[in-house]
């Protein structure tokens, strides 16, 4: 995979103005960054470019502003980034025009500058050619290190790749290498664990995966829709009953592709959707009519463990139960710990992505033991759905 993209190994950046697209979309409260994970992810690329004598010019969006909005300024994020890098980071209060040009002109080799939120200009999301040209004036090369925004064809995430020599940053490179290991040319057998509440948001994903993986574990609220489609009484559980025909179609498609579908065989049921609500495990033939399935049961967990043991590669998106409330995190935490153990024993390549998935792995204290954890939400999902990502396609060596 790496040889299909130009990386930082292919360019001498000394003295060059490097427009570096990064993901600085971090959570903030009262003007302070509350989680610096994304800043830590981009630090290696920024540091490498600066250490090699490049003039590093950061492009990023923040939030979804409608025009200029002080609450969506990147200035406080720049201050947090400076702490993570342990280097000064200059700031320009616009990403184009005179403020940007003046700040860029002042840079010496190895300096770092962050330009203001690209989304303060509506032309960013329209990928407007005149806006792209304004941005391109500020740089000699463009490096895309924001895989999490690669599913959007915006000016700073895609348009610049047509105007300037384009390269993948180290975060982007790591993500593309991991995804290639996951589904591009994986070590077989491959298992996917797909959870979360709704089938409706993951139809494309499931339909793509059944032709790519050897086994597909379906958990979370999604599994209730599949169980209902197969005639299992699910009580008052969350389900999209109108999608029963879709669920059956996916099962048929899996059978035709020789992909084993692994659904729960028992369930943890409670009568209230609340933390520490009294709960009990039931077989599928005995789910109480007024109960709610909130997690997979112990027999299902054992089946998931066995499926992981049979696999060489695991791709995971979505929790197996209502993991944000104890004790309904048990199934997800147990499976995550099991996958982490197999990974540490060098028996499994494990790749996980999506917001809830990352939160669940952190809750199980195993995120660091997985082969790769993607912080990209939408881009990770669209890639798993088999869709081309504009911000990646533009990096391919033509």
Curated annotation (Swiss-Prot):
Pathway: Carbohydrate degradation; glycolysis; pyruvate from D-glyceraldehyde 3-phosphate: step 2/5. It is found in: Cytoplasm. PROSITE patterns: PGLYCERATE_KINASE. One of its GO terms (cellular component) is cytosol. One of its GO terms (biological process) is glycolytic process. Its main location: cytoplasm. This is Phosphoglycerate kinase.
